[in-house]
Amino acid sequence: MKAVSIEAGEGSKAKRVHGVNRGISVFDLVLRIVALVGTLASAVAMGTADQALSFSTQIVNFEAQYDDIDAFKFFVVSNSITCVYLALSIPISIFHIIRSRAGKSRVLLIVLDAIMLVFLTSGASAAAAIVYLAHNGNTSTNWFSICQQYTDFCQRSAGSLIGSFGAMALMVLLIILSSIALSRR
């Protein structure tokens, strides 16, 4: 029997890069779906945060709602817009699974992902500052902590930050993955 030698040429290397890019594209799709769920959960959790104190009177109503604070409104809007963007970018991510060598659409996703990351970061940072003040107050300005009275509201608003900051980390990974796939093209 003769020994047959097989050379690894350009054809086998191209298939390997194509397979790696397809794997990156599948991971990109999964990360987009998880980030979408995180931003949706954050927007819903903050948007439904509401608590009234039990000793409210007919004249004075002690109630905490997300829409009383502009930073929380911005948080809900930024998470909602990012969630819609992620939903609209899923078909492009599926397209990248089918055609893993697509370049222009990857560049578009990198730019749009970066814009949405900045938007999401600004909303989450504004809300995080208010949640910090709600928990700790600021003694030099005589702002007192309200979380001893509004425990449910504070827990819900702080919990909504977790999904948003998680989605921010996933958006950073999405940008890195798209850049890697683009460089391997």
From Swiss-Prot:
The chain crosses the membrane at residues 26-46, 74-94, 107-127, 161-181. Residues 47-73, 128-160 are extracellular. Residues 1-25, 95-106, 182-185 are cytoplasmic. It is a multi-pass membrane protein. Glycans are attached at residue 138. One of its GO terms (cellular component) is plasma membrane. Keywords: Cell membrane, Cell wall biogenesis/degradation, Glycoprotein, Membrane, Transmembrane, Transmembrane helix. It holds the Pfam family CASP_dom. It comes from the Eukaryota. It is found in: Cell membrane. Its main location: membrane. GO terms for biological process: cell wall organization. Homodimer and heterodimers. Belongs to the Casparian strip membrane proteins (CASP) family. Regulates membrane-cell wall junctions and localized cell wall deposition. Required for establishment of the Casparian strip membrane domain (CSD) and the subsequent formation of Casparian strips, a cell wall modification of the root endodermis that determines an apoplastic barrier between the intraorganismal apoplasm and the extraorganismal apoplasm and prevents lateral diffusion. This is Casparian strip membrane protein 2. It comes from Solanum demissum.
